[in-house]
């Protein structure tokens, strides 16, 4: 396996996004959790596929929270820069563009700033069908 940075350096973003799309379709199956990368929603075909083939949950967190997480994460060096900006600026720029895509693709929006147990409870509640009246 290669990191995203290695794949992008060797083959470019377009090739990476094609492989990402193939992977989405390959791993999608009933009763399966698929955690995608943030760029998955850039393709309209991916957005449609995800909405039609599963329950899409957007794990929302403000840009400053995401920036802090990326700065602390050891795998941060494996992530190629999308804009060439500092992490905080890049996250704000990218999130501003992608947030509407995430929101229109998602069936539910979860507060990813909450403690992990709360996020899990939100996800479980989101998957349950509505109670009968």
Where are these regions (language model features)?
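Short beta->alpha linker loops
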Residues: 22, 61, 86, 114-118
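A glycine- and Lys/Arg-enriched "phosphate-lid" helix/loop adjacent to the NTP-binding pocket
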Residues: 52-99
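Short glycine-rich anion-binding loops that position phosphate/pyrophosphate groups of nucleotides
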Residues: 38-41, 62-64, 115
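NTP-dependent small-molecule kinase module
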Residues: 55, 68, 96-133
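ATP-dependent small-molecule kinase phosphotransfer cores
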Residues: 1-40, 44-51, 72, 101
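Catalytic metal- and UDP-sugar-binding loop of GT-A-like glycosyltransferases, i.e.
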Residues: 36, 59, 112
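Glycine-centered loop/turn positions within well-structured domains
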Residues: 2, 14, 57, 64, ...
